[in-house]
Amino acid sequence: MNYKLKTRSEWLDEYHQGVRYGLQGKLILEESSPFQKITIYESKRYGKALLLDDCWMTAEKSEKCYHECLIHPALCCSTQIENILIIGGGDGGSARECLKYKEVKSIDLVEIDLRVIELSQKYLPTIGGDAWSDSRLNLQIKNGIDWVKHTQENSYDVIIIDGADPIGPSKELFSNSFLKDCKRILKQGGVLATQSESPESFQKIHINIVKVLREIFDYADPMYGSVSIYPSGLWSWTFASMKQQRYMHPKKSRVKEISENCQIWSTRWQQGAFNSIPAFIERELAKK
């Protein structure tokens, strides 16, 4: 992936494979942590935004299009949801969505870069919301790969992989060995959820993620939606489970509990998102 970020007057642009994505606004902060370049930008259209290594990660007024779609197909459908693992997710949005469920007793949020959390809390506090002060949230400033590798089997009901694009510290979150470890520590009846890139801008990566998950788990299926600040605007999330497609069957009690507080996700939306797989992707996934 060839990313390049440039500023032209009041615009901040992300260049990717001959396409330019830009938001108008002003630069607030730019620094380098031990792991990556971090940028905070205030856009006129989407509010404050977070960029990592010059890639748009999240923005105040568009983040629900991403976080609700990553979290609720997993938590509404998993057999149990008491113990949750989030890898990445330093902006707090995934934790916020998980904590909408009263059944959730504990969330381990494993983020490698403390500065992502600190700057998100300071400049984008509405994304994490009350999650940061919720006693059920346990912050672990550690390497997610190592955390999963050294965790006992059958430890979590749901695993959420909320990493950046497969460059920098997030690259190994898409590896075969890491996903096998995730399967090992996921309880029977559990669901794994991961962002799985754009089927248009990152076609090969997207297809590979789904295929690897299908090799490791009994079932894995992508769903598709719109995240306007990401390359092409078309994004995907992939869900995996054993024995049955648990992520296809939301539990009515959980739907009732959280649906009124969702802006994007609904059972109807979820069904449509799973059914909206592009034909060319479906053909590629069918190839051996």
UniProtKB/Swiss-Prot annotation:
Which positions bind S-methyl-5'-thioadenosine?
36, 111, 143-144, 169
Q: Provide this UniProt record's keywords sorted from A to Z.
A: Cytoplasm, Polyamine biosynthesis, Spermidine biosynthesis, Transferase
- Read off the InterPro entries from this record: PABS, PABS_CS, SAM-dependent_MTases_sf, Spermi_synthase, Spermidine_synt_N, Spermidine_synt_N_sf
Query: Which Gene3D superfamilies would you find in this protein's record?
Result: Spermidine synthase, tetramerisation domain, Vaccinia Virus protein VP39
SUPFAM superfamilies given for it? S-adenosyl-L-methionine-dependent methyltransferases
**Which EC number(s) does the record attach to this protein?**
2.5.1.16
Pathway given for this chain reads: Amine and polyamine biosynthesis; spermidine biosynthesis; spermidine from putrescine: step 1/1
Q: What is its main location?
A: cytoplasm
Q: Which GO terms describe its molecular function?
A: spermidine synthase activity
Pfam families, per this entry?
Answer: Spermine_synt_N, Spermine_synth
Where in or outside the cell is it found? Cytoplasm
What the entry lists under PROSITE patterns is as follows: PABS_1 (PS01330), PABS_2 (PS51006)
Q: Does the keyword Cytoplasm apply?
A: yes
Q: State whether keyword Transferase applies.
A: yes
Q: For binding spermidine, which residues are annotated in this chain's numbering?
A: 67, 91
Q: Which reaction does it catalyse?
A: S-adenosyl 3-(methylsulfanyl)propylamine + putrescine = S-methyl-5'-thioadenosine + spermidine + H(+)
Annotated catalytic residues: 162 (proton acceptor)
One GO BP annotation of this record: spermidine biosynthetic process
What is one cellular component GO term in this UniProt entry? cytoplasm
Residues covered by the PABS domain: 9-242
Function of this protein?
Catalyzes the irreversible transfer of a propylamine group from the amino donor S-adenosylmethioninamine (decarboxy-AdoMet) to putrescine (1,4-diaminobutane) to yield spermidine.
Family the UniProt entry places it in: Belongs to the spermidine/spermine synthase family.
Please describe the quaternary structure of this protein.
Answer: Homodimer or homotetramer.
Protein's UniProt name:
Polyamine aminopropyltransferase
Q: Which gene encodes it?
A: speE
